[in-house]
């Protein structure tokens, strides 16, 4: 595909925090002398005991250890709430937009302080203190943020489990971190449908040792009739009436754990990613400010769920540490109509909008009409997160949503990294659709070949990071050996991201997908993202997912799942046309061997495509699909199985 370059517009540069020259100067300082750079920027948060040590990190085999600001003491809630009260107590901290468009509320910093203190006192009355783990299984309601910050206030460690996880998944995570207390809601609301959260908690607890969970706190969201276990369960509003709205914040060490967040391993049990207090907050707040070019008084909206790391870093901790107004959205982009995102932007005068490529692609399928009937004049910066954004979706987002006047920050990072690692900066970086562009301050990407040799210049290979940054995860909860094995054993002295990438002649990075999303066709390595981008460039295609499957001749064949735009029909003619299209675009080696038209793709409710399921169906092995409870629409799996193209009695 021809490479398009978008220059930094004067309007972006004129009001940006930094320009290209300043970025280069700061980046050079951050990698040549990280001690001085982070020693200075570590002061962006308040410390009850100032740090004297900045960086103490090692990626050495058998001795992986990551510590930042280790002799300092601070408290995250103090930094996200209390320090703002004198100057911005009456400013809105959180705008909550309900699933129902008629339901929304503004919570000021002063109100947030009172609510968080109340929640902290409710927890403290039930024995929660420093170092205790608390599991949160909540919908996107303000109480989710209150609970996170209440745990932080007490020095307790929160472990959020996304509301789409099944009782089995929830049970394994409660057990994994040893939570004695669970906070949930009677029911969640998403797209007009109810989600039985409390019932799922009850089911999960039945699978655990009887004496593990002592308390379940239930937030009343729908008022639905739910079973309450006497002595164990309590409604939050009743417990909150018994406590005051003042609660001192516990100063904790910089390396005290703030949260555990489980992420899927490529094998076996999910990993409990541990993030700590000081370095994480410095990095989350700094990336939020510079990546989104956040200015005081702006309204910022990240559409993620707090069940995922994006919600932790860029709905709650980063924005609130910066005294921002952050929007929390309970609903989905298509309810009650495809205009919902854009209507919310107009309603709350959103300036910065951060969403996932999968949401953009699904809305693209409905055409420009639902976007163009709204104004979106308040928008200034657009962001993308979660997976590489294909150039066609990037272009639609830029042109249709942003009216070609808003920069797009295509951010690359991971649960493990705590914050954004590779990204454009609005006033400093020329944009290339589909490229995450350049590293953030302190981040040193290196490209490595399969043998572990570091590659120079323009190249393609495995993406690693050479040195630590403050937001980096510290360990896998209860299993440091697994941490070393997963991230540091593949390439000596490097953090291996698990992603492949291409670096172009300008030093820009293009993420090509997980290394396990690489297909080896007749000895040729190919990132699935490239084939997907080609398919989505076809005018009739809304979305595509590509996986490998065993092929008698080639080793692996290419299996493409394609969702068409509204009104298009999946004919044999179109199937042939799409195969020819890819062949012409990338070359014969990239031609899909099998192509299945799919009304929908299996996605988690955060919008990630579940490629594991697609691989199994492509392999005609759908008896072992694993846990599909996190899917937004489990029914799509049945359709995919019914119409699979690789039944064993068919020729490949």
Swiss-Prot record:
Pfam short name (any one): AMP-binding_C
Cofactor(s), by name: Mg(2+)
Annotated binding of Mg(2+), by residue: 536, 538, 541
Signal peptide: none
Gene3D superfamilies with a match to the protein in the record: 3.30.300.30, N-terminal domain of ligase-like
Catalyzed reaction equations: acetate + ATP + CoA = acetyl-CoA + AMP + diphosphate
Gene Ontology cellular component annotations, sorted alphabetically: cytosol
This protein's name: Acetyl-coenzyme A synthetase
Post-translational modification summary for this protein: Acetylated. Deacetylation by the SIR2-homolog deacetylase activates the enzyme.
Species lineage: Bacteria, Pseudomonadati, Pseudomonadota, Alphaproteobacteria, Hyphomicrobiales
Stated role: Catalyzes the conversion of acetate into acetyl-CoA (AcCoA), an essential intermediate at the junction of anabolic and catabolic pathways. AcsA undergoes a two-step reaction. In the first half reaction, AcsA combines acetate with ATP to form acetyl-adenylate (AcAMP) intermediate. In the second half reaction, it can then transfer the acetyl group from AcAMP to the sulfhydryl group of CoA, forming the product AcCoA.
PTM annotation (N6-acetyllysine): residues: 608
One annotated GO molecular function: acetate-CoA ligase activity
Family the entry assigns: Belongs to the ATP-dependent AMP-binding enzyme family.
Residues the record lists as binding CoA: 190-193, 310, 522, 583
UniProt key word Transport: no
E.C. code: 6.2.1.1
InterPro entries hit by this protein: Ac_CoA_lig, ACAS_N, AMP-bd_C, AMP-bd_C_sf, AMP-binding_CS, AMP-dep_synth/lig_dom, ANL_N_sf
Keywords: Acetylation, ATP-binding, Ligase, Magnesium, Metal-binding, Nucleotide-binding
Binding site for ATP: 386-388, 410-415, 499, 514, 525
GO BP term, pick one: acetyl-CoA biosynthetic process from acetate
Leading EC class: ligase
